[in-house]
């Protein structure tokens, strides 16, 4: 939705998020937002703007690199991953790990290690900047869980 990517939409999002973060501060909990290409917070830069505008340790980031990709920017995935750790690294609370393949004009989410995401780079950045961050496996089912776990462990050990 193009309207999601406007500055007006971002400012509306920030103003509506402020009271939610204040509530999180009062209860001593963390709230995390997940940048997604199709949503208002659709880039690493916009996520940084939200964090700076709210300025609270109780607001953090769920980083899902696949969700920041689209067919128009997949050739820049390394830049996006690097930028995420540069601009958001301290505030990344969780990393969602999945992969993607291109089907037509869309990205299809699949299990980590079975698609085109640069996992050596992602896991190297995690190891360097957030070695104890929680990572969740998405698009993993009983049939691929063991292989996905093995892929993640071997790749992490190799970087």
Report each predicted region and the residues it spans:
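Histidine-acidic metal/acid-base catalytic patches
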Residues: 18, 44-159
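Active-site acidic/histidine proton-transfer and metal-coordination neighborhood
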Residues: 1-61
